[in-house]
């Protein structure tokens, strides 16, 4: 009990002379995202099994090799275990779910924040802190977004393993920490800005993957890549570091507690804001890491061909056409190796028969 009271000691978390009852956001609310995680996973499986499978069935060639399977059969197969398989259809359905969620989250975020002063002036995140009220719409926005990242951690146990799996796990953990800690000390306004700015580029990322898999829209792949790359640079490399992080580092302390020094080597309280700023910067380094991957894809695209997946779905995530070509080549080689010895024997046997006929012809007596 003593240790818990020591951990929650107000000066470690809040500005001077502020107590927990005065903070509108309540820590106990962070149990809600944990409770939401399992329902979100169930909703995901149902969404993939119905709307997602219908999209795949009519818009992609994911089921092209299975001529006799029906739409209902595909739905039932995914719902009863296909969601944990490793297949082309599974990878596309993962993209479909993330695209659907990020589209919903971005549009809902715009709706709940369209009249928010801090959307247009980041300083409003700090003016009047920590007494900012939390409207019900913002409350749900925060709870659902946090619950979604918990559901991604659960989903990672049965999703297709991607080449940047561990980077994604770090990203999800940092995001959950940022959302939870920012809610605890009522940094909710800046948290909503981070969520909104990140969701928009994820919409184009997952949308670009879907277009790439869509058999009817192959020519849209490069266009979607340009949209994604533009939104990525605008939100994660410009807005996030130069607007959000810069304001948190240079303006927050002056507007909340003027004598507070963020980079104080003696680490004077409160400590929580320093941890949040550190996590914000760490998240930005992940953005830089992924930017190098994106630039590599952009280079390949500029030298010809379609833009490939920005982040590969697995360590061996080749295009389906390439995988099929390699499989056909392997089967042809295998067939040739089986046929070649018998062919050689037939050729040798034919040559021997010719020699025998010539010898018999020479030995045969001539008729006078």
From Swiss-Prot:
Keywords: Lipid biosynthesis, Lipid metabolism, Membrane, Sphingolipid metabolism, Transferase, Transmembrane, Transmembrane helix. Its EC number is 2.3.1.297. Its main location: membrane. Residues 343-353 have a biased composition (Acidic residues). Pathway: Lipid metabolism; sphingolipid metabolism. Residues 306-368 are annotated as: Disordered. GO terms for cellular component: axon; endoplasmic reticulum membrane. GO terms for molecular function: sphingosine N-acyltransferase activity. It comes from the Eukaryota. The keyword Membrane applies. Pfam families: TRAM_LAG1_CLN8. One of its GO terms (biological process) is regulation of locomotion. It is an enzyme of class 2 (transferase). It is a multi-pass membrane protein. It is found in: Membrane. Residues 90-303 form the TLC domain. The chain crosses the membrane at residues 27-47, 92-112, 138-158, 165-185, 191-211, 225-245, 275-295. It catalyses: a very long-chain fatty acyl-CoA + a sphingoid base = an N-(very-long-chain fatty acyl)-sphingoid base + CoA + H(+); 15-methylhexadecasphinganine + a fatty acyl-CoA = an N-acyl-15-methylhexadecasphinganine + CoA + H(+); a fatty acyl-CoA + sphinganine = an N-acylsphinganine + CoA + H(+); sphinganine + tetradecanoyl-CoA = N-(tetradecanoyl)-sphinganine + CoA + H(+). Residues 357-368 have a biased composition (Basic residues). Catalyzes the acylation of sphingoid bases to form ceramides, which are key players in cell signaling events such as extending lifespan and enhancing stress resistance. C.elegans contain specific sphingoid bases, which are unique or different in structure compared to the sphingoid bases found in other animals. Two examples of these distinctive compounds are: 15-methylhexadecasphinganine and 15-methylhexadecasphing-4-enine. Exhibits substrate preference for fatty acyl-coA chains containing carbon chain length (C16-C18) and very long chains (24 carbons and more). Belongs to the sphingosine N-acyltransferase family. This is Ceramide synthase hyl-1.
